A protein has these predicted regions:
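The structured alpha-helical core of multi-pass membrane proteins
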Residues: 1-277
Length: 277
């Protein structure tokens, strides 16, 4: 709550100096950017602004659908205000040499900068915990569906959905260490992360389409959903493809390893059960 309040306040403070940034809400500018020569490829550069949307409901078992939906309205508002504030800050410093200063930290008053960095570090730790908890939930579901090898699951409290899988925790630890050793700098991780996010979004859309089909939703609604989201997500995917050789291949390699493990485990159990019967 403190982190997102800070984002909103910083953004609003800068936005008050240049309200013209709000014209970015006009969809025409998005269309103009995409159709103009070279503008389309900028989608790959700005895509990390959507970070978090691909895992919005990964903590469904921990937080509940209603809590996530209500909090998302607040989170999105503060994020938009902060991005507008960064835009206003960049316009105010147009033509200047920034010397490595990022708009996010540039918006902060000098006296507040240490507090802002500390709060950003704490927010990163909290966000990492959300990813770890979401991984436990997904692996637990995969085990129940016989898509993942059996693993020891601990329930540290009586609260619904609270669980801990030691083997997954160690896998995440090893993965983080290896990724950091390979990329060395956070800026070099953008390629792998961006490609991961869009592939996750495409998979979520595919699964939701499958769900709508088996639940016999109205066909025009299904097609409307598929066309709308495919246009948006495929556009971002195409714009991200140039990042494949700059680290994006690592995301695909990890995805292939996990998918292969799930495939082998599932069909091996089917073969074994067939002989047992």
């Amino acid at each position: 709550l403190i982190w997102f309040l800070m984002l909103g306040i910083l953004g609003t403070a800068q936005l008050s100096n240049n309200w013209s940034v709000l014209t970015a809400l006009n969809p025409y500018y998005a269309y103009d950017l995409i159709v103009n020569r070279g503008g389309f490829w900028l989608l790959g550069a700005v895509f990390l602004c959507t970070t978090g949307a691909e895992a919005l409901y990964s903590d469904l078992g921990h937080c509940g659908r209603t809590n996530i939906r209500i909090s998302w309205a607040f989170v999105k508002t503060t994020l938009i205000l902060n991005y507008f504030g960064q835009g206003a800050w960049l316009l105010a410093h147009e033509g200047e040499k920034l010397n490595g200063i990022t708009p996010f930290y540039g918006m902060m008053p000098t006296w507040f900068l240490p507090f802002g960095i500390a709060l950003a570090t704490i927010a990163t730790i909290v966000a990492s915990q959300a990813l770890i908890s979401g991984s436990f939930t997904l692996i637990n579901e995969a085990i129940r569906l016989n898509f993942w090898p059996k693993a020891k699951i601990k329930y540290p409290s009586d609260l619904k959905g609270q669980l801990y899988i030691p083997s997954v925790n160690w896998l995440l630890c090893a993965g983080c260490i290896l990724v950091v050793l390979y990329f060395k700098e956070s800026t070099r991780m953008e390629a792998a992360y961006g490609l991961t996010i869009i592939l996750g979004m495409l998979m979520s859309s595919r699964l939701l389409t499958f769900f709508m089909k088996i639940k016999h939703y109205w066909q025009p609604l299904i097609w409307g959903f598929v066309i709308t989201y495919l246009v948006v997500e495929l556009s971002f995917l195409i714009a991200q493809m140039d990042k494949f050789l700059r680290g994006g291949w690592i995301s695909l390699m990890i995805a292939v390893l996990l998918s292969t493990t799930m495939f082998i485990w599932y069909y091996a159990r089917k073969i074994r059960n067939r002989y047992l019967e």
